[in-house]
Amino acid sequence: MNHSDIPAVALLLSSIQNTFRWKLDYGPWQTEIGGQMIFTDNHSKAGTGIVPVIPNYTEMQAGAYGIQKYRYERTAVEAGIRLDRQETRAGGYDWTGNYYGGNRKFCNFTYGLGGHYRLSKYWELTSNFALTWRAPHVHELYSNGNELGSGMFVRGDASMNAERSHKWITSVSYRDKVFHIRLDSYLQWIKGYIYDEPLKENITVISGTYPVFRYRQTPAFFGGADFDFRFMPAASWEYHLIASFIRANEQGTGNYLPYIPSFHLSHELAWTHQTKSHILFRLTARHKFVAKQNRFNPATDLIPYTPPAYHLFGAEASMECPVKH
């Protein structure tokens, strides 16, 4: 019997979003207040023959905020506060036929302080410190089944709390006709960082055997930087380089956290030429380097090693020709 026309997953998602924003400018000051309300209804459609990995759920989010800004000559500062509330109602039957789900409510107050200063004609400095939060997703709370896209059997934790973090970001940039340079660095302390961890066990269901992962929370520290460099020596030539790295550890133990990207570097050299008839030619050579992740704990991942470092090389040639109508 052919069931190839029946999808493995069929979800009906309905969402209503409302946003309100009001601004007032007076001299060097600007005041902004606003609010947002989002209602989401997610239900799986019957008849697929496969139990969905998450239960049906509805979610109501509401928030209100206020921002005060001040600008004077080279300086700009701002401060903001926000209050959010989220309620999630979930219910369904798992692959064993047992009912599961629940009702969770989250409420949080956050704030942010930031400043921007133009050091000179070409240099700028920006810094921001904020308290942020993220409520756990239904997938992290109530997952209990096989993820069709990843081949993992995932279990949520309905007792998890919201993530709360303090984040400090500082940026320095330089910009003129030839160079565009920007360095962003950040530090982040997270209370209740959420991630999925392998339990080092397998489970067998009708469709096969899968490794079991479970969502958990831990205090974590993140630090990293992003570097963006552009060099335009002539109208036809441009060199662009992007590099990024991140460090992440579990607070208290210092253990490495899983799924953290290793050092990345990508750059390209492009040549463009436009003829008098407006035909545009472009040649590009690219290179990307991804380092091996050595900050790795085999106990918190599915396999006891990380992939080796690798290089990717590419080239592209294109032509754009305008067509008269």
Question: Where in this protein do the model-derived segments appear?
Answer:
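Gram-negative outer-membrane beta-barrel transporters
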Residues: 186-190, 207-293
